[in-house]
Every structure is written in C-alpha cells, then in structure tokens.
Amino acid sequence: MSKTSITFASIGRRIALGLVLAGFAGGAAGAAEVTFMMRNSHPNALEVELYSQDRNHVWPGNGEVYYLDDGETKQIPLSCDEGEKICYGAWVSGDKGTYWGTGPNNGEHCEDCCYTCTGGETETIDLVE
C-alpha cells in the first residue's frame, strides 16, 4: 500500500466520523419531551389529538386518538422539537360538533389551547361541559 492511499483512507475515515458525530449532535439538540395532562370533566367520553403548528405532525397519528373516559385524567407524553408550538383538539366521542381547543382535525382557532415544547408537563387541562 502506498503512503498516499493510507493518507486518503485516513482522511476519509475522519470525515465520515465527523459527519456521524455531527448528525448525532444535531438530532439530539432539537429534541424535547412534554407531557400533556388532560382531565375529562364532561359526562361523556372524549377523543383528543395534539397538533404541531410548526410542521405537519399529529399525535398519536395514523388515524388514532387518545381516548378519555368520563372522569379520567390522562398523562400524554410527546417527543417534540424544542420550541415547537403544539395545540390540543378534543371532542365528544361520536359528536365532533362538541369540541375544545382546535377541535377535530385542528380545524378551529382557539385561545389558551397551545403550548410550547420546552420539556416538563402542562398544567392539568380540564375539559368541562
């Protein structure tokens, strides 16, 4: 093996290692977790989705919802991007016309139903009649 090929191989490995390390550092720096505390004080079961306002993302996603029985309090942990704005939409199961926050499919405007992903947990969000 010539001295030149060893030098190029060594440089290539260093570049590859640098790119891998930069990828790990970049991905981890923007990640955060927040827990939404949701309480159903309505006499009927509720369905809840959480919507990013900064990217096209819904929790839990894939056509699923978080389900809260009447009287139930649920902790909903999310992995999100640091600083991301997340709003909740909740509605009576089987009655999308009775809703809280942004409602089904993030379709309504709301006041005080959005939180910034900075870690920790929200105060208890009480969904009342």
How would you label these PLM feature ranges?
Residues 2-16:
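Bacterial N-terminal signal peptides that target proteins for export
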Residues 15, 26-31:
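Sec/Tat signal peptide C-region and signal peptidase I cleavage site
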Residues 30-82:
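Short, surface-exposed binding/anchoring microloops in extracellular/periplasmic proteins
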Residues 82-94:
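A short, solvent-exposed beta-strand micro-motif common in secreted/extracellular proteins
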Residues 92-129:
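Structured interaction patches on ligand/partner-binding surfaces of diverse proteins
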